Regions:
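C-terminal recognition in membrane/secretory proteostasis and scaffolding
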Residues: 104, 180, 274, 282-287, ...
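Short glycine/threonine-rich loop-to-helix capping motif typified by GTGT followed
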Residues: 112-117, 252-255, 297-299
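C-terminal long alpha-helix characteristic of the crotonase
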Residues: 19-62, 225-231, 260-301
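Intrinsic disorder and flexible/low-complexity segments
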Residues: 60-63, 67-97, 216, 287-332
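Active-site proximal loops enriched in glycine and acidic residues that flank catalytic Cys/His/Asp
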Residues: 67-70, 105-107, 136-138, 158-160, ...
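Cleft-lining beta-strand/loop regions that shape enzyme active-site pockets
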Residues: 55-180
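Charged, glycine-interspersed solvent-exposed loop segments at helix/strand-loop junctions
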Residues: 1-31, 175, 179-256, 260-262, ...
């Protein structure tokens, strides 16, 4: 209880019997099917019954272009959101007409855990035999490089900001302010580290707590550099020489082996087609690109507050976590 399990390596959860095994989010379906003793399953909820997608034409070979733009988040609605990206990758994985994938990255980084989950999901595409080519935009740094590093081929613009292979943690400390205003903090906990995060903010960290936090950061950096080394086919030590948060222009990243070629997204698509041995192919965007003019017209589709409220409620109800809570409907 006094080892502050929230900051320990994940394997200790198994060692102490808190969990049975460790799996990636992307692999949960496989685990559930194994325990359920079925090869496939399908759930039906009220919202999914009214949200029927049209069958796609799978006669033409496709190249999927997956756009990963913005900050990387564990959850939310804007930027590169873990569950949204994993869902898009799963859709690509299931489409047998997709023969190659271009990952368009325009991100300064973000959540280390979400980056690891997306990295693993990209690997599952490669395990299926799909070539993955990365096209970097203005920046693909930190987590942006993390999700890119396992690609079969990486393009960057000459002025792309990339690299930033590093990880850090910050904990605010307002202990002096608390003392100045005469505020005291107390509570009852089950072990000495149960309120570590709260105490760190209001009271500061003692040497043991600081060591726990530092250990967590160092494990994250070790994993990050290992992923990069594996993806680029070099030693971890070589990655660490150009790591520690250093940021590189695309043209310099080419010289040190972080990318394979300078070029734009069109060249990345052409390279993906080459690696997949494709002649003619269709390009499919994920998420689907919308026409800005059509989006503007949609704003005028409803005129009353009631109608706009209904639209927002439908949008809210269609979220996966909300759908999971809706009652199951049995069709007889």
């Amino acid at each position: 209880a006094d080892e502050c399990m929230s900051l320990q390596p994940q394997h200790k959860y198994v060692d102490y019997g808190f969990v049975d095994t460790l799996v990636y989010v992307q692999d949960m379906d496989t685990v559930l099917r194994m325990y359920a003793g079925t090869k496939d399953y399908k759930t039906v909820s009220n919202s999914s019954m009214t949200n029927v997608e049209r069958a796609e034409n799978t006669a033409t070979d496709k190249i999927a272009v997956l756009y990963a733009e913005g900050q990387i988040y564990d959850s939310g609605s804007e930027g590169i959101v873990e569950d949204k990206v994993l869902k898009q990758i799963k859709t690509i994985h299931k489409d047998d007409a997709v023969k190659a994938v271009v990952l368009r990255v325009n991100s300064p980084g973000g959540s280390a855990d979400a980056s690891e989950q997306i990295w693993h999901a990209v690997k599952t595409l490669q395990e299926k035999g799909l070539p993955v080519v990365v096209s970097m935009g203005d920046y693909a740094a930190s987590g942006g490089y993390y999700i890119s590093c396992c690609a079969d081929y990486i393009f960057a613009e000459p002025t792309t900001l990339t690299g930033s292979i590093g990880i850090f943690g910050t904990v605010p400390n307002i202990s002096k302010l608390r003392e100045k205003v005469g505020l005291d903090i107390d509570g009852v906990t089950t072990n000495k580290h149960a309120a570590l995060q709260t105490n760190a903010i209001y009271k500061g960290m003692n040497p043991q707590e600081y060591a726990l936090m530092q250990s967590m950061v160092e494990r994250g950096y070790d994993l990050f550099t290992n992923r990069c080394a594996e993806g680029r086919g070099v030693s971890q030590q070589e990655i660490k020489k150009i790591g520690e948060g250093r940021v590189w222009l695309g043209k310099d990243a080419l010289n040190i082996g972080l990318v394979d070629e300078l070029g734009n997204i069109n060249q990345a698509i052409a390279k993906a087609a080459e690696l997949a041995g494709l002649g003619q192919y269709a390009i499919v965007d994920y998420p689907e690109k919308t026409d800005p003019f059509e989006e503007l017209l949609k704003m005028f589709d409803t005129t009353t507050p009631e109608e706009r409220l209904v639209m927002k409620m439908r949008e809210f109800a269609s979220q996966p976590r909300i759908m999971a809570l809706t009652p199951e409907v049995t069709i007889q």
